[in-house]
Amino acid sequence: MFSAIAKRVFGTRNDRALKRLRKRIEAINAHEPELQKLSDEQLQAKTDAFKARLAQGETLDDLLEEAFAVVREASRRVLGLRHFDVQLLGAMVLHDGNISEMKTGEGKTLVATLAVYLNALTGRGVHVVTVNDYLARRDAEWMGRLYRFLGMEVGVVVPRQPREEKVAAYQADITYGTNNEFGFDYLRDNMAFRKEDKVQRDLYYALVDEVDSILIDEARTPLIISGPAEQAGELYEAMSRLVPRLQAQKPEERPEENPELGPGDYYVDEKARQVYLTEGGHDRAEELLREEGLIGENDSLYDARNINVVHHLNAALRAHTLYERDVHYLIRDNQVVIVDEFTGRAMPGRRWSEGLHQAVEAKEGLPIQAENQTLASITFQNYFRLYDKLAGMTGTADTEAFEFQHIYGLEVLSIPTHRPMVRDDAHDLVYRTADEKYEAIIADIRDCVQRDQPVLVGTTSIEASERLSKALKDAGVEHNVLNAKHNESEAQIIADAGRPGTVTIATNMAGRGTDIVLGGNLDQELAELGEDPDPAEVERRKAEWQDRHDRVVNAGGLHVIGTERHESRRIDNQLRGRSGRQGDPGSSRFYLSLEDSLLRIFASERMSGMLEKLGMQHGEAIESGMVSRVIENAQRKVEAHNFDMRKHLLEFDDVANDQRKVVYEQRNELLEADDVAETVDAIRQDVVEKVISEHIPPGSIDEQWDVPGLERTLKEEFGQELPIQRWLDDEDDLHEETLRERIQGEIEKAYRAKEAEAGASVVRHFEKAVMLQVLDKHWKEHLAAMDYLRQGVGLRGYAQRNPKQEFKKDAFAMFQEMLEGLKRDAVGVLLRVQVRAEEDVEAVEEQRRQEAERMQMRHAAPASAAAGAVAAGSGAAGAAAAEGDSAPTGGAQQQSAGGRGQETVAREGPKVGRNESCPCGSGKKYKHCCGKL
């Protein structure tokens, strides 16, 4: 109550922030009359004047008011669009490095020009980030006219672009591109073999369009550059044959207090997106695996040697039970194509990690593509935090304001609309069954069509959109479908969606970034007439459009129908936001049923009881604010759970990110250096010193020395045959310190002889090539080992250890081990390999170029069922498994924590029966403790 009173008296934090910014709008407007008097040349000269003032010590804040006024005047002349005062407000928020929440149709693309121009004056490059290549090209071309008028260079980066074009795009003042392309270019730059191969400059200012989609929805999906790893197609196929022979447990067979009761072999927890084997299911699975010859006669699933089998069984169970065709993926060109759960778009090239994608391919009887080993990866959370300054804009960010602040340090400010919002958002209608719900939706659509009112129907899956499409066909209602299967004609469908009586079915937010104009898109119609259209035809088209527009307005504007609530309120708000743009009339309503996923999982019992008490008949619906609040509370639960997942992932990924920064910094120093001889000499002396200490401990007596072992190591690892034992036999006064100096001196002499033979310049070139290649090799193996560690560390929670602290401790130890290993490896290569000419160095670089050609760029979709659903049942293990959702494992399952291939592990103690007490001392049975699958 007190907070409500305080808000009324003092205003909200948002109100106070906007009030402070509004004072500057008057100053911006005051520049307008004088700027209108300037010629084009005088207006264009302002850019150089601003740059000169910056060079003299003024700040961007000092220039803001006049610079914004210049952009507004230039936009009026070039684009015929003048920025509203609320758009100036939004741009100031963007310049301050925050998030501007502006409703659909408020001109976010135009708002961006103000902040982008101001920050581009520094000459350090501004990146404008969009959600797809179409929008990047469109905005670069559309707004590029304005920037070029003001003397700014504009570039656009897209996939498969020639290197020269990409370099030019990044050298431009303003660069448009997608989040994926910017991220992949960053990773590729940090794998470059020559500094000339790098394309990006330092990361200065990023302005992210649809910031909620990129920084929230895709936060758990890392960008991965990978190479082919070991193929295990036969094992995936065998598991796919085995899973249908296991019987699913029905919900009524497993009471809440004892979920392992019942005859089934496994049960599916839809809320947690997990699959668990029952006690009988373990025995049945072992029996089937023995039949297939996948485990030994006396083996169990618990044996360490079978961890790979468990991994594949887990993937197959998830593929068969949690992932449905035409809901979670499509089959296109004999390949599994993932469908984005947030936008409903197909995502070619993206693959689930942890073997899930291969398991789905096996389930569908498709060719199984090789698993990939991660060469480099980064999450969007960590990539965008590399920029000195980050800002974003969207129509729906307020519900995630805490996460933006907590993770990225970005404030969300809601900008008022230019015209008042008049859309009518009706209460949800809740039906008992999906059939009743669809009957009501079709009746509503028929009513709208009869009144010439356009309808946009939002569905949560391709399956739902096609079910509704079939029902409309049967009812004789013409309509357009916009989903991942029909995205080629997306722009045309969206352009026509505002015409009188048009019905458009779209999955979630397909078509986001394109406005639905009431009456249809007039600009597109006029553009189709060509460069020199007949004026009479233009007038006729305008008159037709005006007539259509008026009919739609009189019918009530665009009517939005939601067929199901999404897990996130923000996605629902985006769907509603398609209607009522810029003060247009409009309406929206969600139709729900107790069979919908969200209600079935989170709110069904309470809601079902409520409807039963009301004695509802077939076709009756309940409509009340109380029902809407129950649904909103369910959504809040899911949002909180998803936020915890993203936060959990970030805490783990921050460890890898700190290591990534160190490795990339060292790599860039190597790349930039013309001569790394000093570094190589220091590393060689350090490595040789440690090798000597392994066999001759410092301060030890002669009897403790392992001279034969030292001679063998120097010969096998470093190619140096030194008669150390003979030296000791021949020279009585050769003690430890002088022996160390002599070994170092002999190795130094051998290296200098090699240098003299090949030439100093050739050896310098070779040193750099070897250092880069060895660093990349060890970093790749370290990434695989880190993923392996991340998947298993949750199990330590059973031993009352904190998995996060354990991960940090082990990851640090592994990183130290990697650094020592790469130094030793590099010294070994440099001492062993004979380099006689520049061609030998070129051969190393050519090998590297061939490896680069085999690399694959992919945006790893999170495997919604957590990693190790079979291997980690609940508690800390389950939490870690959930964290491992999107871990880019690739070939990690073939790697041990040290990066070596899998080995058969001998059991150290006696075999523990499943019903015996757990050896950890917890007092629980083994199957309920450390042996829990």
UniProtKB/Swiss-Prot annotation:
Classification via Gene3D superfamilies: Helical scaffold and wing domains of SecA, P-loop containing nucleotide triphosphate hydrolases, SecA, preprotein cross-linking domain
UniProt-annotated binding residues for Zn(2+): C918, C920, C929, C930
Localization of this protein: Cell inner membrane; Cytoplasm
GO molecular function, one term: ATP binding
Catalytically driven reaction(s): ATP + H2O + cellular proteinSide 1 = ADP + phosphate + cellular proteinSide 2
Region (Disordered): 567-588, 840-861, 880-933
This protein's record includes keyword Lyase: no
Membrane topology: Peripheral membrane protein
Record key words, sorted: ATP-binding, Cell inner membrane, Cell membrane, Cytoplasm, Membrane, Metal-binding, Nucleotide-binding, Protein transport, Translocase, Translocation, Transport, Zinc
Family: Belongs to the SecA family.
Stored PANTHER family: CHLOROPLAST PROTEIN-TRANSPORTING ATPASE (PTHR30612:SF0), SECA INNER MEMBRANE COMPONENT OF SEC PROTEIN SECRETION SYSTEM (PTHR30612)
Name used for this protein in its record: Protein translocase subunit SecA
Organism whose genome encodes this protein: Halorhodospira halophila (strain DSM 244 / SL1)
Gene label: secA
